Amino acid sequence: MIDIFARQSRPFTDYVIAEPEAVYAARRCDCLSSHALIEFRRNPLLFRKKQLGLIEEEERAAFIVGRAAHCRVLEGEAEFRRRFAIGGPINPKTGKSFGQDTKAYAEWAAAIGKPAISQDTADLCDRLTRAVREHDVATSLIAEGQGEGVVRAEFAGLPSQIRIDWTHPERGIVDLKTIDDLDYFELQARSFGYTHQLAFYRAVLAQVTGRKPEVHVIAVEKKEPYRVGVWRFSEQVLDAAARENLAAIERLKVCRAQDCWPTGYEQIRSFDYLA
C-alpha cells in the first residue's frame, strides 16, 4: 500500500523516458500504439498489412512539417536546428528552391541524412512558437516538464507504447495540434480520433503511475493570425473513448487468434438518410 501511495505521489515526468524517434518507431512491430489502434478500429485489414510490412507508410512533406513544428514549439530552437536541415536545392530555371514534394528536393534531403524543411517552413515554425508562447494558458502548460516522453507498459494484456508531445509533472498530458482554422478544432478532433488517441495515452500513463493524468490539447493555426486555443478533455469523454479502445483491443485479440482481418464492409449496408 505504501508503494502505491509513493508511486501516485511522484511527478508524471518520473515515468517518461527520452528516446530517439527512430527507436520508438522500431518498436511499433511489437508494441501497440494509439495510432495503430485507431487504424485497427477503422480498417483491421489495412492495420494487418501495415504490421506485416506489406504497405509502406507514406512520408509526406506535411508529416515532416508537423514534426518540425512540434520540435520547434516544444523542444526549442537548438534542438530544432539539430534535427532538421533548413533550405533546399535551387531550381536553376526559377532561382528558387525546389518544392518539398519534388524528386530533386527528396534527393537533396536524402544526401543530408536528416529530415529537410524549406526556409518558409522554418519561418512558419518560428511564428507558431511565438503564438503559443504569447498564450498565457498554453505557456503555463509547457513551462515545465518533458517533451516527446515515451512510456511503455502492458495494457489490456498487450505490450503498448505512447509518445507524449509534452508531459507536465503534475497535470500530465499536453498534446500539440496544428490546424488550418481553430473554429473547426472540435470537428477535426472527431474526424481524426483525437479523443481515442488521448484516452489511450491516459490509460497507458495511468498504468505505470497509478493515477489518471489531466489531458490538455494546445491547438495553433498555421496561418494568420495564428490563433491559439487550449482544450481540456473531460473525464467523461475520455472514459467513454477508453471503453471503446478496450473493446477494440478485445477485437484485435480475436483477429490475431483467428488470423481473420476484415475490412468492416463485408455485409450490405443501409443508406437511409439525406445529407
Residue ranges, per PLM feature:
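Coil-to-beta-strand transition motifs
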Residues: G157-Q161, H168-R171, K212, E224-Y226
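Metal-dependent nuclease catalytic cores that hydrolyze phosphodiester bonds in DNA/RNA
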Residues: M1-Q161, T263-D272
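Conserved catalytic cores of phosphodiester-cleaving nucleases, focusing on short active-site segments
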Residues: G147, I162-L187, Y201
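Short, well-structured alpha-helical interface segments that form or flank functional binding sites
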Residues: I64, Q161, G193-H196, F200, ...
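Hydrophobic/aromatic-lined pockets within catalytic cores
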Residues: V73-L74, A78, T178-D181, A206-T209, ...
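Short histidine-centered catalytic/ligand-binding loop motif
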Residues: L54-E58, A110-I117, D183-G193, S234-Q236
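Secondary-structure boundary elements
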Residues: V137-A143, H168-I173, A206-P213
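Metal-dependent nuclease catalytic regions and adjoining charged, substrate-binding loops involved
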Residues: I2-T13, Q188-R190, F200-A275
